[in-house]
Design a protein with these regions (language model features):
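Generic structural signal for secondary-structure transition and capping sites
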Residues: 24-27, 128, 155, 229
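Proteins enriched for Cys/Gly/acidic motifs involved in redox and nucleic-acid/cofactor modification
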Residues: 1-105, 115, 161, 183-194, ...
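Conserved SAM/AdoMet-binding glycine-rich loop
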Residues: 1, 88-214
């Protein structure tokens, strides 16, 4: 086995102590590690704002759901405060990040649940940050509501989406546990481009997934060519 143990992200500060237990040494002999420092945003052109963590999906190639736990979202007011702080520090662009960004379901000041499109609208209306960029969004979480918000603010919201398609073959996608077909993904791309004609699309693709035949690989390659991604992150499958 290549992996003996997976430690969840919130427990990373305990890694040194656990390693000491395995090695049989005193943890006091290991230099202490702080809980982290706030990164000085002055002079930076872009700053990540984490709005979500965790994942409820069970894709067969992924261990993130175990490492990061169930989906949870940062409250709307907290997100807005972070964006304003970045703006006051002179940062011209914030990037909204999360393990499963499209699953954002944070609470508002009135205790109502807010989805990603509503959060983006709130950032536009209640902050003056010059530019906002959305990081990776699962294909099945792309909604026309989100696209219309992006289209309403072309000068402030980057016309960019990263779509972790993983494969362009429906049979491979099913083995991966992905909840969409290759055809459904292309329908999503058409919807995106109908609302955002100038959009730039990037993607993640896994090659060599267990059971993938030469024919399935060619199907995946053909889809990528039809879509015409601006950039691709290609990963060879590994255990």
């Amino acid at each position: 086995e290549l992996t003996d143990r997976v430690i969840a992200e919130p427990s990373k500060i305990d890694v040194a102590e656990r390693v000491c237990e395995v090695l049989g040494v005193e943890s006091d002999s290991v230099p202490a590690c702080s809980d982290g420092e706030v990164v000085d945003a002055l002079g930076r052109s872009r700053l990540g704002v984490k709005i979500q963590d965790g994942c409820n999906h069970r894709c067969t190639y992924c261990i993130v759901w175990k490492a990061r736990g169930p989906e949870r979202s940062v409250p709307v007011e907290s997100v807005l405060e972070q964006v304003r702080e970045a703006q006051e520090a002179g940062v011209p662009e914030v990037v909204l990040t999360g393990v499963n960004l499209g699953a954002y379901y944070g609470k508002s000041a009135t205790d109502e649940h807010v989805e990603i499109d509503e959060l983006l609208e709130a950032i536009m209306e209640r902050t003056s940050i010059p530019h906002v960029r959305i990081s990776s969004v699962e294909p099945m979480d792309i909604s026309e509501r989100l696209l219309k918000v992006m289209a309403r603010y072309p000068q402030r919201i980057a016309p960019f989406l990263h779509l972790p398609v993983q494969s362009g073959c429906t049979a491979t996608l099913h083995r991966m546990g992905r909840p969409y077909s290759a055809e459904a993904f292309e329908d999503t791309v058409r919807m995106i481009r109908a609302n955002l004609p100038q959009v730039s699309l990037s993607c993640d693709v896994i090659v060599g997934f267990p059971g993938e035949t030469d024919e399935e690989f060619e199907e995946s390659l053909a889809l990528c060519r039809r879509v015409g991604f601006s950039r691709m992150h290609v990963f060879r499958y590994s255990k």
